[in-house]
Amino acid sequence: MVEALLSGIVLGLISITSAGLFVTAYLQYRRGDQLDL
């Protein structure tokens, strides 16, 4: 049970992190050289 829970948490964090990086990279690509944080 613990191993399944830990694996689920790890996969969740990895998916969220990868999604966040993809979104930020996409927004930077759309904006170009503009840095509007």
Swiss-Prot record:
Subcellular localization: Plastid, Chloroplast thylakoid membrane
Disulfide bonds: none
Keyword Thylakoid applies: yes
Pfam families linked: PetG (PF02529)
Chain segments annotated as transmembrane: 5-25
Origin: domain of life: Eukaryota
Record flagged with keyword NADP: no
Keywords for the protein's UniProt record, in alphabetical order: Chloroplast, Electron transport, Membrane, Photosynthesis, Plastid, Thylakoid, Transmembrane, Transmembrane helix, Transport
Bilayer topology term: Single-pass membrane protein
GO biological process: cytochrome complex assembly; photosynthesis
InterPro entries attached to this UniProt entry: Cyt_6/f_cplx_su5 (IPR003683), Cyt_6/f_cplx_su5_sf (IPR036099)
One GO location term (cellular component): chloroplast thylakoid membrane
Molecular function via GO: electron transporter, transferring electrons within cytochrome b6/f complex of photosystem II activity
Family stated for the protein in its record: Belongs to the PetG family.
Function: Component of the cytochrome b6-f complex, which mediates electron transfer between photosystem II (PSII) and photosystem I (PSI), cyclic electron flow around PSI, and state transitions. PetG is required for either the stability or assembly of the cytochrome b6-f complex.
Subunit organization: The 4 large subunits of the cytochrome b6-f complex are cytochrome b6, subunit IV (17 kDa polypeptide, PetD), cytochrome f and the Rieske protein, while the 4 small subunits are PetG, PetL, PetM and PetN. The complex functions as a dimer.
Protein name: Cytochrome b6-f complex subunit 5
Organism from which the protein derives: Psilotum nudum (Whisk fern)
Gene expressing this chain: petG
